[in-house]
Regions:
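A ligand-binding cleft/hinge motif common to bilobed small-molecule-binding domains
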Residues: 69-73, 193-212, 255
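Early extracytoplasmic/lumenal segment of secretory-pathway proteins
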Residues: 10-73
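Periplasmic-binding protein-like
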Residues: 93, 106, 166-170, 176-177, ...
């Protein structure tokens, strides 16, 4: 739009949650550079839908997603501008590629309401116990790339037993909710007792605000969800976009990421929560999108019954 172009020094960032982190990074960058940042924050699904809808007149300069997959998809489509940040040295190799890099990392766990009157779960399969009958929610893998990753990770580590587990959870009354927040809210409010595969940082924030929740990472393993940042090739402000990514990866920017209860992408920035070395991380590499589609279809069919 003409309005946006009239301000030569405006940068538009489309980002998944948390909104408070996006605002904090935008204001920190603005203070440092004088570049005004416009933020559009929504779920990854909504952010991606908006990008698709704006193809004829692209608005976003920088995209921060909650799903590594979206970055790989846009890379394949040739939408991304290659960029190596000077601050990328401290970011592990598996969290960066030629045209996207992690802002931070979350992991999926069991989020349990400690006042629910249920025994504290330690393992995924504990949620199939009679104590958890009709008391478990899970985010919808059709709406959450990380939830689909968890299904794939468990299938990779457990083989056919993973599907036995999903079947037993279904028989025990597990409900497939919408995105992460919709799965966590009933557990926080006490209507349900536990979430199978919730995003950790959101619940750490809730705990800090006094909620009676606990985040549990099963020893058998879980999956991580690195949050990729990328610059769109259509950006009219590639210089400012690169400077923004440099800022997010600076010690100051990464401290803000840590304040949001995420794991920083940089190894040399302290976190307020367990880091990767405390987790058993399951591999989620699958044979591309067809495999993802097959796992999603099988799960959706199981839970539609």
């Amino acid at each position: 739009s003409a309005m946006m172009l009239s301000s030569a020094h405006a940068l538009t960032v489309y980002t998944a949650g948390p909104g408070s982190l996006a605002k904090s990074l935008a204001s920190g960058f603005e203070q440092q550079t004088g570049v005004k940042v416009t933020v559009f924050q929504a779920t990854t699904g909504k952010v991606m839908a908006r990008l698709e809808a704006e193809q004829a007149n692209p608005q976003a300069d920088v995209l921060i997603s909650a799903s590594w997959d979206t970055a790989e998809d846009l890379h394949q489509r040739g939408w991304l501008l290659p960029f190596a940040s000077a601050n990328a040295d401290q970011v592990p190799a598996n969290l960066k590629s030629a045209d996207y890099i992690a802002q931070g990392v979350s992991a999926l766990g069991i989020v349990w309401n400690s006042k629910s009157g249920t025994p504290e779960p330690k393992e995924w399969r504990d949620l199939t116990q009679p104590a958890f009958k009709d008391k478990v929610t899970t985010p919808d893998p059709a709406l959450s790339g990380a939830s689909l990753d968890l299904l794939i990770g468990l299938q990779n580590s457990m083989g056919g037993q993973a599907w036995q587990l999903f079947d037993e959870l279904k028989k025990n009354g597990m409900v497939v909710s919408g995105p992460n927040a919709q799965a966590v809210t009933p557990v926080m409010q006490g209507a349900k007792a536990a979430v199978f595969g919730a995003v950790d940082y959101v619940s750490y924030g809730n705990i800090q605000q006094g909620e009676s929740l606990k985040v549990i990472f099963p020893a058998s393993g879980t999956v991580i969800a690195p949050r990729p940042m990328m610059i769109l090739k259509t950006s009219q402000h590639p210089g400012e976009a690169k400077a923004f990514i440099d800022y997010v990866l600076s010690p100051e920017g990464q401290a803000k990421v840590a304040d949001a209860w995420l794991m920083p992408a940089r190894r040399d920035v302290a976190a307020k929560r367990p880091l990767l070395d405390a987790l058993k991380v399951l591999p989620t590499t699958s044979e591309g999108s067809s495999e993802r589609g097959a796992v999603l279809a099988r799960f959706s069919q199981l839970y539609a019954q």
